[in-house]
């Protein structure tokens, strides 16, 4: 794509990530510089409803916001307001504050600058097959005294 990728992760170093992404010192720098802001966070007390008008106001006037992580990260009413008043150019969502979608999210359906899809893109035949194969291979590896290829890591929050 020829796209320059920038990001922020308080637990990652540029040395670890290599040239895949240019890490910024703060999340705000990413919001201010990116043409596409895509969030990838879990919902924990410190992140729940942590994204709203303030963050959207940092974005370029032509930037796009994408949330495929968790709906509860967003102050959905502020997202709607920013999309309506032009603070935010457009959004792509496949997660919502309340799922299944409730009447409180209805305003999103009336906006021309929002694309919404179901949160199930990873549930394809191939992805399920890959997941099952990976798990089976790692079970065999562990039973044979070897290290698994895919290891779960406890997140640090």
Predicted feature descriptions by range:
Residues 1-4:
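Conserved anion/nucleotide-ligand pocket segment
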Residues 7:
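Conserved SAM-binding motif I beta-strand of class I
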Residues 10-106:
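Rossmann-like adenosine-cofactor binding region
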Residues 62-64, 68-157:
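Rossmann-like dinucleotide-binding domain for NAD(H)/NADP(H)
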